[in-house]
Amino acid sequence: MNEHTQAEMVEVVKKFFDGVFDGDKWNYDVHNEIIFSGGIKGVSGKITDFRFCITVGEELVTCYHVAPINVPVEQRVAVSEFITRVNYNLNNGNFEMDFNDGELRYKATVSQNDLLRDDATALRSMNYLMTLGLAMWMRYGDNFAALLFGFAGDKSIEDLVNQCETEE
């Protein structure tokens, strides 16, 4: 158990969203005092709008960047292969799919120690948390869409993943 309280972490997250660190304010809602949510628009690519959900745990703050589409039942096995191949090479965070409803999201975490060290480290950590998922969606999102909407042509799932990982 860490010496910092969950309430302290919630306050750091609120300060970030309220622009205390850098003047950039975010639109967000607070649910149950430990869950924050909002939306992000304007990401480049075929999937452009995301919801974010941040949960404040006892040791970690987790951000989910949720795509605005749900994978149809008949495509969930193919998408799970795509996700598995992508996740194998990721160092930080991972893609997830809910097999019950097809929800797609990217999950990233930071430790409470990074958020509570000092304001500069907290800002850097929160920026990382908020941008990592978006960067991953920008990198892999077009080929998620290609797989979901039939734009992949004769490319295999492995080819789609390799294309994402070799493009600059």
What is the role of each PLM region?
Residues H4-Y28:
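Amphipathic alpha-helical segments
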Residues G19-I47, V61-C63, A67-P68:
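Ser/Thr-rich, low-complexity intrinsically disordered terminal regions
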Residues A67-R105:
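Short, internal acidic amphipathic alpha-helical interface segments
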Residues F95-F151:
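Charged, low-complexity intrinsically disordered regions
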Residues F52-I54, E59-E74:
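Short, conserved beta-strand/beta-arch hydrophobic-aromatic motifs that form part
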Residues F144-E168:
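Short, highly charged C-terminal tails/helix-capping segments
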Residues N2, Y64-P72, D119-A122, M126:
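Short histidine-centered catalytic/ligand-binding loop motif
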